[in-house]
Amino acid sequence: MNMFSSCMITALVILTLPIIMSSTKLYKNKLYPYYVKTATSYAFMISMIPTMMFIYSGQETIISNWHWMTIQTMKLSMSFKLDYFSMIFVPVALFVTWSIMEFSMWYMHSDPYINRFFKYLLLFLITMMVLVTANNMFQLFIGWEGVGIMSFLLIGWWYGRTDANTAALQAVLYNRIGDVGFIMTMAWFLLNLNTWDLQQIFITTNDNFNLPLLGLLLAATGKSAQFGLHPWLPSAMEGPTPVSALLHSSTMVVAGVFLLIRFHPLMEHNQTIQTLTLCLGAITTLFTAICALTQNDIKKIVAFSTSSQLGLMMVTIGINQPYLAFLHICTHAFFKAMLFMCSGSIIHSLNDEQDIRKMGGLFKVLPFTTTSLIIGSLALTGMPFLTGFYSKDLIIESANTSNTNAWALLITLVATSLTAAYSTRIMFFALLGQPRFSPMILINENNPLLINSIKRLLIGSVFAGYIISHSITPTTIPQMTMPHYLKMTALAVTILGFILALELNLTTQGLKFNYPSNYFKFSSLLGYYPTIMHRLTPKTSLTISQKSASMLLDSIWLENILPKSISYFQMKSSTLISNQKGLIKLYFLSFMLTMILSLLILNYHG
């Protein structure tokens, strides 16, 4: 096992070499991106050695080399947990990052700060590796916050654009809400169990884990863009396409789901948390799939599909299948990163045009990119024998055979069908039909950096699902009987989605313009969530604050207490002291009546 742990640590150390290099003159060299890409590829190849050893032997390792500090009775040490989840995820993340970095060398070649961009990507990858291999909550929190801050820096890379700055701040603010849950969980474990070590937490027999698990669920909701904290993910598409491909499809956004997988031993017997996870994931996967149907920005459609797949992973955890959720994380990384890279290739070729209504006919001028996009879309929908099929089909089968509420299962099936619909929509608008872009644009995809990076992920999108699914324990699957209609459910709803999209396409051809319906507005305006949360809520808050400030400060203190109070007291005192009101006629009449009455009384007595 020494070789096992040594190879893994070597792979992690290799990644830090370009960071150390940034303090030397080599950092200013034009070849620095090449050094970073090469270091990532070597780290991937070395990490495959312990992964293959683990698959063969099935023994996990915990490395605790460096004791950091002791707080009263609690010890904090640097500890790495090399188990199934970390051993499979590390090579997948390194392979995807290797391809994305090669793609970035083509996509960002004209950026004057490309060296800093690659350093940020590498720092993000290192913090993600720290998160995945952490064996205690403190180390996990370092990786958790690391991916958060690197996400902020990379989303706001083009800081001259207002939208990019707003999107970066939005991502940080939504993730801070999730971080509150993470810190609350850490505090609870510290107060009640006096440990942050994962093994010690798991062996504790405490039935009252609702509060820390709710904190973990809140943390996962923020980081994995679940319903309620979801708007930051589509907004993050303002960053460069390589950032979207790496952070917001295959690594950072799955950190929340990975956190719940890590703490699944605490969740598996807690029905309350599992039900919440199931319902939250089901709502997310349906809502974001509906939103994706009417979007026109190609990157935002892919972003909403990411959020929908994250909801599907949460559903899988909710039905007590963490290994299937992890399998979907790994398979999803290949085709989703490739979809973003194909989108980036199209956007770059069309002079930064992202509207699918202004594309069309690209299969003639970008044959390799469009072929990869179609295969990636088919893998996303779960087409048989592509990578997505091996995880998505198993998830739908597990949901069909589990004793959960049929409501969550039904809306998950609807979302699966809608996935096929919006994937078909991208193909129709962007790839097929007549070109709708300027004929003056020179389109060229003959660049080895672009072709090789997409080609590697294309191979992964076809074969990776078969390879990874056969390494999940137990490797020998027991025989299981299932009715044909249940077995074919996933494929049936996918085909239904394709048919629905084709029918809608045929129906809408040649129609006159009509004002959009309320359903269309609900989908295109993202369920009015950004309008309510980002416009109405701040406006209402500012209006109430302004009114209360002006009424309390100006009207009450500055007017009533000082100037108005003086005049009020003067008028009140003058009213009390002087009863003279200036009514001369009334006074004269009163005087005459009094005189006449007095004379009459005197005459009467006389």
From Swiss-Prot:
Keywords: Electron transport, Membrane, Mitochondrion, Mitochondrion inner membrane, NAD, Respiratory chain, Translocase, Transmembrane, Transmembrane helix, Transport, Ubiquinone. InterPro entries: NADH_DH_su5_C, NADHpl_OxRdtase_5_subgr, ND/Mrp_TM, NU5C-like, Proton_antipo_N. It comes from the Eukaryota. GO terms for cellular component: mitochondrial inner membrane. Signal peptide: none annotated. The chain crosses the membrane at residues 1-21, 43-63, 87-107, 117-137, 140-160, 171-191, 241-261, 273-293, 310-330, 365-385, 409-429, 457-477, 488-508, 582-602. Its EC number is 7.1.1.2. It is found in: Mitochondrion inner membrane. The keyword Transcription does not apply. It catalyses: a ubiquinone + NADH + 5 H(+)(in) = a ubiquinol + NAD(+) + 4 H(+)(out). Pfam families: NADH5_C, Proton_antipo_M, Proton_antipo_N. Belongs to the complex I subunit 5 family. This is NADH-ubiquinone oxidoreductase chain 5. The gene is MT-ND5.
